[in-house]
Amino acid sequence: MDRSEGMDTLENSMPSGMSMGMTMGGHQGHPPPDIKPDISSLTSPTSTHGYYGFGPGGMPSMASSTQPSPGPQQMHSPGMHSPTSSMGSPPMLCLSPSGPSPSPGLPHSSLHTKHICAICGDRASGKHYGVYSCEGCKGFFKRTVRKDLTYACRDDKNCMIDKRQRNRCQYCRYMKCLSMGMKREAVQEERQRVKEKGDGEVESTSGANNDMPVEQILEAELAVDPKIDTYIDAQKDPVTNICQAADKQLFTLVEWAKRIPHFTELPLEDQVILLRAGWNELLIAGFSHRSIMAKDGILLATGLHVHRSSAHQAGVGTIFDRVLTELVAKMRDMKMDKTELGCLRAVVLFNPDAKGLTAVQEVEQLREKVYASLEEYTKSRYPEEPGRFAKLLLRLPALRSIGLKCLEHLFFFKLIGDQPIDTFLMEMLENPSPAT
């Protein structure tokens, strides 16, 4: 099923009575309540939910818990709190046979193997570069070697690397790959074999772009990009302004995701899980890139300009400075274009570590396709900058860390009032706004 067919199955009217409000006051300094989602109608026989936490040195990590789905479940982060509220009965989904289905080229994961990944303990997909490993660790090692990437550990170079925490520290993950026997020369030999086939490398790269066209990713960015010719300085509290802008952007975020190649081919519940896992990073990346044109502040989709001094006066200067320094300034310095922004956001969207996914391998493959298409794009568009692809990927850890801190600072606390984000996204996906 192609993307247009997947979207046609969702073409209904917007759910009535949906309203979103801001309730920032009275919550500062108090942890939000735990999530108690009941999504037993979505996953069977078990479902897993994850949360972000902080590892040593402030590095982000993913933690998870696995519980039977028939009853309400709780998700709690000891290190931080998510912008959530208690949740009533979620809208029931009826996934008809004509609904979104996985692409024929992306078979559902049904492989059972007796081997586990020597690096993180996840299920191994085979022996890669001399070691039984999962697709995630295989791809991580291959990118590290091919791009000659270097990492730094923010702790004592002894971070725990397992299925839940493998994204915490890239340095320690790479060192564990080496210590468990992964061979750098195996990656290089693999690449050499491809080159010896003549045009094979070009065909492979071109094929990746055809399956994940950057042109379509750019179209998704342009379709939801607010047209801002002029902007005015914000007068209200900057936290309120940011939350209200993000509140409105959640609508366009769902529409953006549906335009990303293959997203609507995933199971509907997986679409919700991916958006739930990445919405904060996706929004932050968007307004950071938009703020390239702003002077010492961020430019919101509403046209309001939030100055650095206002953020400091509101007590959120530290995280605001990080946004300006680690994201906005870096994007400005390298003149990151919207195609590159869209690809980075697609990488965030296709997060195979999001807990509860049923199509983990498909999502992993889609992320790899985005990587391949982005690499091809940077090589062809910026041939004089051979390190540009790696430079782009280095923004992702900063984006993840800042996204967590923004949640911790309650930037998006009670983002949609009493409407929990899970239910809101579910309704948006099930009943999208009419195409314009």
Curated annotation (Swiss-Prot):
Zinc finger (NR C4-type): 117-137, 153-172
DNA-binding region location: 117-182
Comp. bias (Basic and acidic residues): 189-200
Record-level GO cellular component terms: nucleus
Biased composition (Low complexity): 13-22, 85-98
Keyword Flavoprotein attached: no
Chain segments carrying region Modulating: 1-116
PROSITE patterns listed in its UniProt record: NR_LBD, NUCLEAR_REC_DBD_1, NUCLEAR_REC_DBD_2
UniProt keyword annotation of Cytoplasm present: no
Annotated residues for binding of 9-cis-retinoate: R290, A301
Region feature (Hinge): 183-206
Cysteine disulfide partners in this protein: none
Subcellular location: Nucleus
Subunit structure: Homodimer (via ligand-binding domain). Heterodimer. Homotetramer consisting of 2 canonical homodimers. Within the tetramer, each monomer binds one molecule of 9C-RA and a NCOA1-derived peptide containing an L-X(2)-L-L motif.
Family of this protein: Belongs to the nuclear hormone receptor family. NR2 subfamily.
PANTHER family: NUCLEAR HORMONE RECEPTOR
Protein name, as recorded: Retinoic acid receptor RXR
Organism: Biomphalaria glabrata
Lineage of source species: Eukaryota, Metazoa, Spiralia, Lophotrochozoa, Mollusca
